[in-house]
């Protein structure tokens, strides 16, 4: 179950109907009980977001360097090639043509405003939420310290 405390759901896939009812398998496959469809992840997007994201630490990246930056950081955070590819395919068109991007990977601001209730609890859970602001000029910012993700037993990437 997903509980948004500072926004409303706008798009979900598969359809979110009072929660997702899926079975997770050790290879990461999710089977949706509503229609039997198989998924690698559950997608949601929000509107009317009132969360105040933390931009006190992060990275100022030239738009032309966004792809290599994301590959490096996402790999460090434990994503597989396929997971990185899907993340980059979604975000790169929005970011690479900006002069610069101020990029942060949110933790508490994200997990506190988008709470998950997963039953049974997975052995490991990776939640990556990137926030960015397009910039015309580079800015100095304290680099953000990122954490890696170790996959153990039944794991989920959200």
Q: What name fits each language-model region?
A:
Residues 1-158:
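Protease-labile, long low-complexity intrinsically disordered regions enriched in Pro/Ser/Thr
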């Amino acid at each position: 179950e997903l509980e948004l405390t500072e926004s409303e759901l706008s798009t979900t896939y598969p359809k979110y109907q009072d929660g997702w009812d899926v079975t997770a398998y050790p290879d990461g496959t999710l089977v949706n009980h509503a229609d039997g469809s198989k998924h690698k992840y559950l997608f949601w997007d929000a509107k009317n977001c009132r969360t105040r994201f933390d931009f006190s630490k992060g990275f100022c990246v030239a738009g032309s360097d966004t792809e290599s930056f994301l590959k490096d950081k996402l790999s460090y955070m434990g994503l597989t090639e396929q997971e990185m590819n899907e993340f980059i395919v979604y975000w790169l068109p929005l970011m690479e043509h900006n002069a610069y991007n101020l990029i942060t990977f949110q933790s508490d601001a994200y997990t506190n405003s988008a709470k998950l209730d997963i039953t049974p609890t997975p052995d490991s859970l990776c939640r990556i939420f990137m926030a960015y602001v397009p910039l015309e000029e580079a800015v100095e910012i304290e680099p953000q310290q990122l954490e890696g993700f170790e996959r153990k037993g039944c794991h989920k990437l959200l």
